[in-house]
Amino acid sequence: MKRIIIYIICLISTITVYAQSSVRGDQAPRHFVGKIYNSQYDIYIHMDLENSSIIVPQQEIFGKIPGYLGDNKDSRKWLITNATITSDGKASLSIINDYGSEDLKATLQMLNDTTYILLQESGSTIKLARNRKWLKLPQKLIFKKDTKR
């Protein structure tokens, strides 16, 4: 009888452990996590600036990084090598191309829950391959978080 009571207590305690939520109420919202898109240039940013847990597909040699800028029409990536969240809604980024030959400093600013602005501040300009030519992106790019994807 004593064993049965001990087993029941152990069973009840394990059930209550699984009932605990992994998200605490005191955690701040995670604004700089996920994918954001720019439909004009057909590019996206896959990011986790808070934990640096992104692995670039087919380029795993770089390890875990804060994120990358990808292109839906080309396999080249621009890697976010360092990210510092400076204030609520702003992050300073260090970005390099996947060859390591070009780098720049940029700021990613969150305007609202679905709109972000990437400002290229100093260094090289982000370039994409389009129609066998390099296309320089503007200094200011607007990205949207698509909740449907």
Where are the predicted features?
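Bacterial Sec-dependent N-terminal signal peptides
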Residues: M1-G25
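Central antiparallel beta-sheet cores of small beta-barrel/beta-sandwich binding domains
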Residues: S21-K105, T125-R149
